[in-house]
Amino acid sequence: MMDQTVSNNFKMIYIASCGEGINAFHLVESTLVQFPDSDITVVKVPHIRTESQVDHLLDRVKDVESLIAHTIVEPNLRQYLVTKAEEHKIVTIDLMGQVLNKIETFLSIRPLGKPGLYRETHQVDLKQVTAIDFALAHDDGLRPESLDEAEIILVGLSRAGKTPLSMYMGVMGWKVANIPYVPGVPMPQTLDEVDRRRVIALNINIEQLLSHRKMRQESLGTSDMHAYSRRQEVEVEVQTAQKYYITKGFSMIDVSNKPIETSAEEIAEMITRRFKAQAHLKD
């Protein structure tokens, strides 16, 4: 459920949500900007739908100095979390319950208490459309003159997964550009002019990269072995790329055998942690 190992030396805030928890995560991160000297880590725990999942969460955090902020809309499960957390002396913040109660009183209508309704009824909003359009317009090194408008810039070798990751993050509402790294081919000058903290280099192991490239060749109807898919050349290409990323000071993440969703969440959390309320650029 959680993808981070927690050290007892840190204070933690866990975002427990029956959905993705993205909005709650941004709310907490934006609030933490007011506490610049705090040493605290925020972790999302999405898709909390059962009491056993609540128990698992509490078992993981009970020995850590932590706080649980939650956006659980199902009232019984929400109360279960609050009650069990109190038993473990864990502080909780209800980010959803008070809002639901006030609106229920105002409208004199009971809420449905069904998770994910907003996502179902607002599948595509303006922010998503804008972000997806941006990803399409800045795919594979296009429009380098407007890299400064990107919230995230992905750099990686051919077939490292830049395009699908850019598109997925566009659906999440992030404006992402991606630039291919080809040894011997100059990178755009504008890449040196942007905030390098927004540049994320994608590392991928050689076996998976070779597999992706061979599949690409087959889809194009070409099976001739050449530098694009020969192991020796690809090994050199990977080493050269990594040296370039290190020289430029780019952050690197390993996307080998990792679902796009996991890589996207990792990058989004990294950028949000670095830029807080300024993670998303204003139009």
UniProtKB/Swiss-Prot annotation:
It catalyses: N(tele)-phospho-L-histidyl/L-threonyl-[pyruvate, phosphate dikinase] + ADP = N(tele)-phospho-L-histidyl/O-phospho-L-threonyl-[pyruvate, phosphate dikinase] + AMP + H(+); N(tele)-phospho-L-histidyl/O-phospho-L-threonyl-[pyruvate, phosphate dikinase] + phosphate + H(+) = N(tele)-phospho-L-histidyl/L-threonyl-[pyruvate, phosphate dikinase] + diphosphate. It comes from the Bacteria. The keyword Cell wall biogenesis/degradation does not apply. InterPro entries: Kinase-pyrophosphorylase, PPDK_reg. GO terms for molecular function: ADP binding; ATP binding; phosphotransferase activity, phosphate group as acceptor; protein serine/threonine kinase activity. Signal peptide: none annotated. Transmembrane segments: none annotated. The keyword DNA-binding does not apply. Keywords: Kinase, Nucleotide-binding, Serine/threonine-protein kinase, Transferase. Its EC number is 2.7.11.32, 2.7.4.27. Pfam families: Kinase-PPPase. ADP binds at residues 156-163. Belongs to the pyruvate, phosphate/water dikinase regulatory protein family. PDRP subfamily. Bifunctional serine/threonine kinase and phosphorylase involved in the regulation of the pyruvate, phosphate dikinase (PPDK) by catalyzing its phosphorylation/dephosphorylation. PANTHER family: PYRUVATE, PHOSPHATE DIKINASE REGULATORY PROTEIN 1, CHLOROPLASTIC. This is Putative pyruvate, phosphate dikinase regulatory protein. It comes from Desulfotalea psychrophila (strain LSv54 / DSM 12343). The lineage of its organism: Bacteria, Pseudomonadati, Thermodesulfobacteriota, Desulfobulbia, Desulfobulbales.
